[in-house]
Amino acid sequence: MNAKRRTLAVLAAVIAVLGLALWALNRRTAAEEAASSAAADGTIPLCSFSTADLSRITYTYNGQTLTLDDADGSWTLAEDSDYHLDESACNTMVTALSSLNAKRQLDAQAGEDYGFDAPELTVTVTAAGQTTTLTFGSSNTVTGDRYVQKDGDTALYTVDASRTACFAYDKAGLFGSFSPAGFAASDVEQVAYTLASGEKVSLTAGSELAGDGDEADSASYETVWRFAGDADTDLDQDKVQSMLSALSSYVSGQITPADGADPAACGFDAPLAVVQVTTADGTKTLTYASGTDGDYLMVEGDDSIYAVDGSIVQAVTQTADALTAA
């Protein structure tokens, strides 16, 4: 019995030692991976700040200067406050700058062109009241890293080129897709619209017994769309739902008054459809038109012109006959 106990004790000790060795190996591997990652990104601090302290990013890319202001996590374009920004793209810039390290520090060589005479990208970041300006030149032909200089520092540095990719956007590239209509398809209670032909169509949602159910309880009811004042004509509910989804859909671009939004140039002198959408919050007018460069939307109370896909226009310009069930 004693021999058996000693054997078990030895096995337990061996297992404990192996477990400790495995833990140490995993920890060492994690440390090596972290060190390798840090080495790849660089270890020479160029720009460092808490993301909570950031207030402004100004960058010039290919000659266009954009100034992004951060107010309590909401981004605004200083040059055009009406413009809807891609919040994710702005936050990616913050992440790239908040811990930007250089991989190498070099001495500039006479006669060498580092791309600073006409830099593709210049970034100025303001955080905690401190301003840092970085000028990015050309890429090293061997390593692919980009040359960078920091204002107030005569040294030349290189950074991983991937850290600057998030700034390769002009104004249009920073647009954040959203729904300017401001409602969901499920919120809509009534739709009334006039087509370019002059045809007027009015739709209203009602609650009806689902299928052949004859139980008068809420579980057997469903929302059914019909022509206003016409309870007998069946509509193609899928086409109606496509229309509701189109009315509440995201837009793909924006032309603000600051950009010279011109309704006439975008076809709003002869709109394809003028749609009044009623929800619990009230009635809003959406106008759709077609210009030489595509299809557009304007929303009541908003002076911007929004680019929409052609399929959206098709869905919201259906005639009464097209909506009637076969």
At which residue positions do the language-model features occur?
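Soluble, acidic/polar mature domains that operate outside membranes
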Residues: 1-326
